[in-house]
Amino acid sequence: MQAFRPLPRTGVVFVTAEAVARGYRAGHPDWCNLGQGQPETGPLPGAPPRIGELTIDPSDHEYAPVGGLWELREAVAALYNHLYRRGLPSQYAAENVAISGGGRAALTRAVAALDQVNLGHFLPDYTAYEELLEIFRRVSPIPILLSREQAYRFTVEDLRREVLGRGLSALLMSNPCNPMGKLISGQDLARWVELGRELDCSLLIDEFYSQYVWNLGPGEPGPQVSAARYVEDVDADPVVIVDGLTKNWRYPGWRITWTVGPRRVIEAVESAGSFLDGGGSKPLQRAAIQLMEPRHVLAEGEAIRQAFSRKRQLMLQRVRELGMVLDREPDGTFYAFVSMRDLPERIADGMAFFRAALDHRVITVPGVFFDVNPGHRRAQRLSRFHQHARLSFGPSLDEVSRGLDRLGEMIRAFAA
């Protein structure tokens, strides 16, 4: 059918489909999914009890408002004010929040609301940005390369040079960054927000991993990180934040996310949602209100950091023992972005490593998927990340350990 174009699968979807063809299914005891982009969702020591059932009010079988249930919008605004804006004169309100059905829906709404602008994005970054930035032709995506040799550091002075030199009106980024875990926090994040305000460059910040923070920057009180802490005027500063239940609450299947920003932006995001997706699930939005209680959020975050820091320590130790190279230890997220360049030649490539790992019933994500190239406008040369892979410590500690054991067996077999 010539009316339709072929669409690529994003990283996790691609590797999962390849694994399914070899017998993988979610929860299969013989497989280790080190490619997964979601955290383990079961009980954690010290965490609030998991929600096991929902009671649905008959009125909630109707559509939810495109912008989300007002009560949930109020609860999200109150949470951000409690966590990040106590004592500040400018406070978020329900009008500063829009609810949507998943992170991609929230990001798609935000990009659809942009005018004809140059939008900067970093390399590497979240795989889904590639198709997202291609479909809206009003937006001109401008790649900003981060240097492996400099451990992917990028200062506010570097940002100023890019904004002024390339005429950027907006910047899309994940913080902490998926895949390599680089975190901008504290004084550095405050300066980024200040620069956005000074140069009127809108910062679209994906904060889905803001509870998974391991190394805080100077001046960052933590324990979770958000640009909301450094906004002066919630209705004037060009800072738009996207987050949700997916990672920081460990409820990815709920598909409940939110956008927080100036009222004018939220109105545009709502309008975009009216033709893009129509809004999220009303019963689940109702159920999510209780999860916005600050004590619940803080307890969940502490439990996450306790459990996932142990898995992070195991991951970093084992990948080094196996001969992989960490260009940068992850400051946040639950991923390690590793290089295979010192491994045996036949598996020194991320895609070759992925296919070999499937033979051992382990899933990984090749690094090329994070070389975001909207519309494939850049020449199809060998990716700078072709020797990299993203390994997830999102699964249980036992699954992560077994997966690393199997990768060790595989590497030793290729080295023999």
Regions found by a protein language model. Name each.
Residues 60-199, 210-234, 240, 328:
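Conserved core of the PLP fold type I
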Residues 26, 166, 198-199, 322, ...:
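Helix C-cap/helix->beta junction micro-motif
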